[in-house]
Each structure stands twice: as structure tokens, then as C-alpha cells.
Swiss-Prot record:
GO molecular function: DNA binding; DNA-directed RNA polymerase activity
Quaternary context: Component of the RNA polymerase I (Pol I), RNA polymerase II (Pol II) and RNA polymerase III (Pol III) complexes consisting of at least 14, 12 and 17 subunits, respectively.
One cellular-component annotation, GO: RNA polymerase III complex
Name listed for the protein in its UniProt record: DNA-directed RNA polymerases I, II, and III subunit RPABC1
Species name: Kluyveromyces lactis (strain ATCC 8585 / CBS 2359 / DSM 70799 / NBRC 1267 / NRRL Y-1140 / WM37)
Length: 215
């Protein structure tokens, strides 16, 4: 196996670990063992005898934890798929959407290598009420939420959001905003109208919280 292939496998392994962490951070059940998968075990499990990654085998389903269902009763199961094809066309995306809708997944996460054609992107809304999210592999090689400058973000339930607005006598329009395309919003799968609590460290008061609404 040449160095370039080794590098690519290492990047894919890191992206796979980030996806597992992302799914866990959204409140789905992922074991620590899955996240701690070593590079050697990853190769043994997901690469063929020639050392070529078999991305289809990396796909997985995850269900919400009991704690998540208590906080977000409407939360459903999720399906993650890594695409074998370098460029994603209409047929591949149609198959993915059919899988998500037929199996009644609430969320489908589609990880692609280099690009999705505009025609394929137009198919995504047809999965409604399910939500399809797409991520390029390269964006997942590093988990952005692990960066020391990125504070902890926690998604609030509808009840927590109402309590927050009531406590501070605020309207939704008065809350600071976070864009839906913000990297952390994408990581957490935030939807319009949802509020996140951001916990930052402070030199004077230890920790303090601020809130943002997703638009």
C-alpha cells in the first residue's frame, strides 16, 4: 500500500470517528468502543484484501438514547451512509432517499467524497418529513467541536426554550442568532427555531452561558 493510499485511509478513519461522535453528541446511542476504534481495526473491518476502503460497509443506524427521548419525544432514528462513488448523481441520491423514507428514518446523513450534482441535490427535499443532511468527507476529518476555541453547545428542548423566553421576558426575535449553515449548527443538525445554550469559560466567573436561536 503506497503512502497516498495510507493517508487517504487514515483521513477516512478520522472522518468515521467524527461522524460517530457527531451522532452521539446529537443524543443517539453510540458506544465509546465504536468511537475508540483503532486505525488497524478500521482497516480490518472496512478495507478489502487490497486495502481499498469499502464505504458501503461503514453505513450504520442509530437510535436516540432514553435520556434524549425524554427531552425530545419526537426524536426518531437516524441512518448514516458513506458513498462509494466519487461524484454523486441522481440515481444514487434517489436510492438513498427511498431507503430513508421506506425504513421510516427521521434523519439521513449522507457522506460524499467530492461532489453532488445540482440535479441530485434537488432530490433531497422529496424525503420530507425526513431530513437529509449531506457532508463532504473532508469536512469531518477533524471534529470542530474539539477545538479549544469552540465552546460547548447544547440544544434546548421546546420546554426549555419556552422557560428561557419566559424567565428573561424575551421574544424569539430578541435572541442572538446562529445561522443554520454555521459549522456547529450543521454538526448538531439544528433546525430553524431551535435554541442552543453556549457555555463559555470566563476568567472572572468560571463559566457563563449565552443563547442563540437557529435561523
Amino acid at each position: 500500500m503506497d503512502q497516498e493510499q495510507e493517508r487517504n485511509i487514515s483521513r477516512l478513519w478520522r472522518a468515521f470517528k467524527t461522524v460517530k461522535e457527531m451522532v452521539r453528541d446529537r443524543g443517539y446511542f453510540i458506544t465509546q468502543e465504536e468511537i475508540d476504534l483503532s486505525l488497524e481495526d478500521f482497516k480490518a473491518k472496512y478495507c478489502d484484501s487490497m486495502g481499498k476502503p469499502q464505504r458501503k460497509m461503514m453505513s450504520f443506524q442509530s437510535n436516540p438514547t432514553e435520556e434524549s427521548i425524554e427531552k425530545f419525544p419526537e426524536m426518531g432514528s437516524l441512518w448514516v451512509e458513506f458513498c462509494d462513488e466519487a461524484s454523486v448523481g441522481v440515481k444514487t441520491m434517489k436510492n438513498f432517499v427511498v431507503h430513508i423514507t421506506e425504513k421510516n428514518f427521521q434523519t439521513g446523513i449522507f457522506i460524499y467524497q467530492s461532489g453532488i450534482t445540482p440535479s441530485a441535490n434537488k432530490i433531497l427535499p422529496t424525503a420530507a418529513p425526513a431530513v437529509i443532511e449531506t457532508f463532504p468527507e473532508a469536512s469531518l476529518v477533524v471534529n470542530i467541536t474539539h477545538h479549544e476555541l469552540v465552546p460547548k453547545h447544547i440544544r434546548l428542548s421546546e420546554a426549555e426554550k419556552k422557560e428561557l423566553l419566559k424567565r428573561y421576558r424575551l421574544k424569539e426575535s430578541q435572541l442572538p442568532r446562529i445561522q443554520r449553515m454555521d459549522p456547529v449548527a450543521l454538526y448538531l443538525g439544528l433546525k430553524r427555531g431551535e435554541v442552543i445554550k453556549i457555555i463559555r469559560k470566563s476568567e472572572t466567573s468560571g463559566r457563563y452561558a449565552s443563547y442563540r436561536i437557529c435561523l
